[in-house]
């Protein structure tokens, strides 16, 4: 049985190095691995010993914490219907009608998944150990992210077929689905807290559990929207939140004179519980575990308008192309009808699509004072984690 357990854990740890795939689960035996201190000699405290003191029971470890998510499995969290848009145009030619009248429509972002979601964290790690069995730990560092999805996942909309030249109270009437939206965040302060403990030990095997919570609030550094009828890139985008984000947007939306705009900030929250099994092989401690986690990335459904000029220069207010379709001449009486107007997109709330995952890793110990842990995670994300620490 012991040989089978050793083989299974070693195979899992080796396999993870070949295919790197929530928060790290960590080695369940970690609280009891470093039993000697770099600065102070370790004391093996026994909670059943009447002469034991808290000085014997408590120790501190510190180190580096790096977590790198290459692809988190996320989806957008939106309602089934969207309000405020005008009805979709149906006329074979001419202009669209009723573009100032709101009509409830099916939300084309509903059920959409993100194509790519990356999250990188580098932090300092500090753990308070009790009786060489339980850890209470925290991390303080910095995180940044990248998100990519189809344009319909972020409600990219616009107005086509505008009659006349008055933009007041005009509402978008078409969705722009054949495009890509990319979000790059800046690097912002992040923190996490957690606890880990050994629940059961038998010889060299340890079964343990852990709980963690992490948070960060980075701002959107770059927004890139690529589609045929409208494309734009914004550095440090600003937009409308709350009731100000409702259609119709202000006429000045997207211009340099726009007011009541706010920075686009992504509020990241994640919590996780995990269970793992390890087996010590001298200096190497491989482990395998499962985790259940929930992550959310919420930007308060901020709506960001396409940049445009307040007044035309060389007959242009945006770089949007003219769309003639089957027409052979321009409609000079409705000069804004043939290209996309009042384009905007919304950063919808994103959350985990899969809650459960698997973690495999191994810890290398040196002199019972130093350790380095590598871990890979699969199913709910593809991620790698590294932790190097020492005991004081």
UniProtKB/Swiss-Prot annotation:
One of its GO terms (molecular function) is porin activity. Pfam families: Chlam_OMP. One of its GO terms (biological process) is regulation of cell shape. InterPro entries: Major_OMP_Chlamydia. Residues 1-22 form the signal peptide. It comes from the Bacteria. Its main location: membrane. It is found in: Cell outer membrane. One of its GO terms (cellular component) is pore complex. It is a multi-pass membrane protein. Transmembrane segments: none annotated. Keywords: Cell outer membrane, Cell shape, Disulfide bond, Ion transport, Membrane, Porin, Signal, Transmembrane, Transmembrane beta strand, Transport. Part of a disulfide cross-linked outer membrane complex (COMC) composed of the major outer membrane porin (MOMP), the small cysteine-rich protein (OmcA) and the large cysteine-rich periplasmic protein (OmcB). Belongs to the chlamydial porin (CP) (TC 1.B.2) family. This is Major outer membrane porin. It comes from Chlamydia psittaci (Chlamydophila psittaci).
């Amino acid at each position: 049985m012991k040989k089978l357990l050793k083989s299974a854990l070693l195979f899992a740890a080796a396999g993870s190095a070949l295919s790197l795939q929530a928060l790290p689960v960590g080695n369940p035996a970690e609280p009891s691995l470093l039993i000697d201190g770099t600065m102070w000699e370790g004391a093996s405290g026994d909670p059943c010993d009447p002469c034991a003191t808290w000085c014997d029971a408590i120790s501190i470890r510190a180190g580096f914490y790096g977590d790198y998510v290459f692809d988190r499995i996320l989806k957008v969290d939106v309602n089934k219907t969207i309000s405020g848009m005008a009805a979709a145009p149906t006329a074979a030619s001419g202009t669209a009608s009723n573009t100032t009248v709101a009509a409830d429509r099916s939300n084309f972002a509903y059920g959409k998944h993100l194509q790519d979601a990356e999250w990188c964290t580098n932090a300092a790690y500090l753990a308070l150990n009790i009786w060489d069995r339980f850890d209470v730990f925290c991390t303080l560092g910095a995180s940044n992210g990248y998100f990519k999805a189809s344009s319909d996942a972020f409600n990219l909309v616009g107005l086509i077929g505008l009659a006349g030249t008055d933009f007041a109270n005009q509402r978008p009437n078409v969705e722009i689905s054949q495009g890509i939206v990319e979000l790059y965040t800046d690097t912002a302060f992040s923190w996490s807290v957690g606890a880990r403990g050994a629940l059961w030990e038998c010889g060299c095997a340890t079964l343990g559990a852990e709980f963690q919570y992490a948070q960060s609030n980075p701002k959107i550094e770059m927004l890139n929207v690529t589609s045929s009828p409208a494309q734009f890139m914004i550095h440090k985008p600003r937009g409308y939140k709350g009731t100000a984000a409702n259609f119709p947007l202000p006429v000045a939306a997207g211009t340099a004179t726009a007011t009541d705009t706010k920075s686009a900030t992504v509020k990241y929250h994640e919590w996780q519980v995990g269970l793992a099994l390890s087996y010590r092989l001298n200096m190497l401690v491989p482990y395998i575990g499962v985790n259940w986690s929930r992550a959310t990335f919420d930007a308060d459904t901020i709506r960001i308008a396409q940049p445009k000029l307040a007044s035309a220069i060389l007959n242009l207010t945006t770089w949007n192309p003219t769309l003639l379709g089957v027409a052979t001449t321009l409609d000079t009486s409705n000069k804004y009808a043939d290209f996309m107007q009042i384009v905007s997109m919304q950063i919808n709330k994103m959350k985990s699509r899969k809650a459960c995952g698997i973690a495999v890793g191994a810890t290398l110990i040196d002199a019972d004072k130093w350790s380095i842990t590598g871990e890979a995670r699969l199913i709910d994300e593809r991620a790698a984690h590294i932790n190097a620490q020492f005991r004081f």
